[in-house]
């Protein structure tokens, strides 16, 4: 068995004296592990870092075997990502989200969103908006997608500012006003198609976004598996909070 594909490194662990087991999210073969000979060496360390993009060639005698990788760098992001706390936490959290996907099951949209998110980590606000969208995409890919296209009560597609915590559907301003204290806030950048790039956010939008996705991830995905939110998610949100406070302190 043999294939070649684009991939992003999610994690690496040492195996024996000199090898490493590398976990990739690939474009066409999903989340996939393989062994890299000499992967524990100092020469390979810069390449085998989470967030780096590679061209991966995988080979095994049988499809169900772990197999061996040969990896070639296509984009080395790790050195830049390690330069900011929000990026370090963000990459770790993205990897934990990708691990919610079944192994060896292709999820090309998730792969593309991961690339988009990793390439926009320079700006903490844009990175946060992308990460929230990534969490929404994970929910959808696992069968728990939110319906943010129209009001669940009236069918209206305008003034969608709430989300029902029960159904995961959008609610308009007028329909939700009597129950606003029980509803989740829908951030502007999630209801504006033009904000796909991640722009147009406010600090409150970001916190509302993480509250929204966090609620449904915990209830529908994590708790049924006996899991909770990653420490890296909390670290990322704390780093964003500190970054938002800096201008006021200067």
From Swiss-Prot:
Keyword annotations of the record: DNA damage, DNA recombination, DNA repair
GO BP terms, alphabetized: DNA recombination; double-strand break repair
GO cellular component: bacterial nucleoid
SUPFAM superfamilies: ArfGap/RecO-like zinc finger (SSF57863), Nucleic acid-binding proteins (SSF50249)
Keyword flag DNA repair: yes
Listed InterPro entries: ARFGAP/RecO (IPR037278), DNA_rep/recomb_RecO_N (IPR022572), NA-bd_OB-fold (IPR012340), RecO (IPR003717), RecO_C (IPR042242)
Pfam families tied to this protein: RecO_C (PF02565), RecO_N (PF11967)
Function field: Involved in DNA repair and RecF pathway recombination.
Family: Belongs to the RecO family.
Name of the protein in its database record: DNA repair protein RecO
Organism: Rhodopseudomonas palustris (strain TIE-1)
High-level lineage: Bacteria, Pseudomonadati, Pseudomonadota, Alphaproteobacteria, Hyphomicrobiales
Primary gene name: recO
